[in-house]
Regions:
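Hydrophobic, aromatic-enriched interface-forming segments
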Residues: 112-114
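Conserved G/P- and acidic residue-centered "switch" motifs that form tight phosphate/ATP-binding loops
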Residues: 109
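N-terminal beta1-alpha1 cap of cysteine-dependent amidohydrolase-like domains
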Residues: 1-106, 116-117, 124, 128-167, ...
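Active-site-proximal beta-strand elements of phosphoester/diester hydrolases
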Residues: 208-212
Length: 248
């Protein structure tokens, strides 16, 4: 049975945006042998939890919203987009379950920001940089990312371009600032120092988040490898739990 990956609907207020972006995430996990499970934003917490409990891992996708700055005790920047409280609530349920049950987590773009705030981190609400971090879908390569050599991400990506450097797309205007509990910075944009990836510090819990959109470039091995790492972590967790059950 393939691992089931919980993916929340990206945005509660824009069905067209959600239906345009969500299939890319679903296809990305299907390509590496997993089953995507859509998590609705308009159901009761009890209904959502029943779906979440059936899943083996979590993928937090991007969104056109911004995390409510009140969640990290900040005043709203004039360029901060409206929040999506329904998405925030579902993300919190997903992350609470993932941390309680040690389920693997992958955050992408908004998903990185949501994860960091959940772990009591803060965000840069609007990046002031000459680098075009908000390049969007029409720009396949926006800038490069330098990955820490000793990180899990470096071992996952194994970049052929040059050691621990990859070229990425980019569709964000916010970034992690103060890093949340149990997370560490593992990649930055070398041109301006903007944080581009985080991962968990616990060796027995797979947590990875990237600021770019690997689901848009799954024909490239570094992008596909990111999703493969999530699925492999989900399989490893399942095998470990099965072994513990059999030994009882």
């Amino acid at each position: 049975m393939p691992p089931r990956i919980a993916i929340p609907i990206p945005h509660s207020g824009d069905p067209e945006y959600a239906e345009r972006s969500l299939p890319q995430y679903e296809r990305a996990v299907e390509l590496v042998g997993a089953e995507p499970v859509r998590i609705p934003l308009d159901k009761s917490p009890a209904t959502v939890m029943k779906l979440i409990e059936r899943c083996d891992a979590v993928l937090l996708p991007g969104s056109k919203a911004d995390v409510d700055p009140a969640k990290y005790d900040a005043e709203r920047h004039p360029k901060t987009a409206p929040a999506d409280p329904k998405r925030d609530t579902v993300d919190e349920l997903l992350l609470q379950d993932a941390y309680n049950m040690r389920k693997p987590v992958l955050g992408i773009c908004y998903g990185l920001q949501s994860l960091n705030v959940y772990r009591k981190g803060t965000l840069v609400q609007h990046i002031g940089s000459a680098v075009n971090h908000a390049a969007g879908r029409k720009v396949p390569i926006a800038h490069s990312v330098q990955i820490d050599a000793g990180s899990k991400l470096a071992s996952v990506v194994n970049s052929p371009q040059s050691p621990f450097v990859i070229s990425v797309n980019s569709s964000h205007h916010q970034a992690a600032e103060v890093i949340g509990d149990g997370l560490r910075v593992v990649a930055k944009c070398p041109e301006d120092g903007v944080i581009e990836a985080l991962e968990g510090t616990s060796p027995d819990h797979f947590v990875l988040a990237v600021q770019w959109h690997p689901e848009r470039s799954t024909e490239d091995e570094p992008s596909r490898a990111i999703f493969r790492s999530l699925v492999e972590a989900a399989r490893a967790r399942h095998e470990k739990l099965s072994g513990e059950f059999e030994s009882v």
